[in-house]
Amino acid sequence: MTVRTPAAATARPLHLLLCGALALWLAGCQSVPKAIAPTATPEQVVAGWPARRAQLQARAQFTAQGRIGVVAGADGFNGRVRWVQDGARSTVSLDGPLGVGGVRIVNDATGLTLTTPSGEALDSQAAHDELVKRMGFEPPLDSLRYWVQGVPDPASPGSETPDAQGYLGSLAQSGWTVTISAYMQTQDGALPQKLTVARGDVRVRLIIETWHSP
């Protein structure tokens, strides 16, 4: 499935917030922390990539926090995002511009649940419909848990292209294109700092500010 960020305290067309949200998003990009230079040579990264990819695909727990900007056709919004992975359970918290509104999405083996800014809890088809309504498209949640870490979803075939440093630079998978423009050094090695997920007229940009794992 795919993810959608809250546009306001109540669901309403995202185009009402497009201009202001994108202006805030562009302004906020100026204060993004600089990526740390990689500690391994490109040759070392390429040689170790199969093992590194398998390690990240099997990674059971992590937390990523940062900013999200979405354009879906003529609509768009930006906000804060917090992704918590615990085994097969993904919990995504999204806050709209200036902290207005908040949506909590949980995706696991039992299905999808969504809590609206008003506290209403939805599940199954109702949660899916609300998610698509708020996002403007159906986000690939099952794959995003891997893409955000800079690796392909092991459940689907994909085409990988390395960057100049030997890390994953772009990925074509399940009709989506993932482009990673910057990495940052963390306690778990190099992980994406800036990435874009796109398909058709949908573009999701993520700027990860902090990574954490137990």
How should each PLM-predicted stretch be described?
Residues 66-70, 81, 92-94, 169-172, ...:
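Short beta-strand segments that buttress and anchor functional surface loops
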Residues 150-214:
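Gly/Pro-enriched, hydrophobic low-complexity segments
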Residues 88-138:
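An acidic-aromatic
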Residues 117-174:
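Flexible, processing/modification-adjacent segments and terminal tails
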Residues 25-28:
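C-terminal motif of bacterial Sec signal peptides marking the signal peptidase cleavage site
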Residues 2-18:
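Bacterial N-terminal signal peptides that target proteins for export
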Residues 52-74:
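A short, Trp-centered hydrophobic/proline-enriched beta-strand micro-motif
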Residues 30-33:
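Bacterial signal peptide processing site
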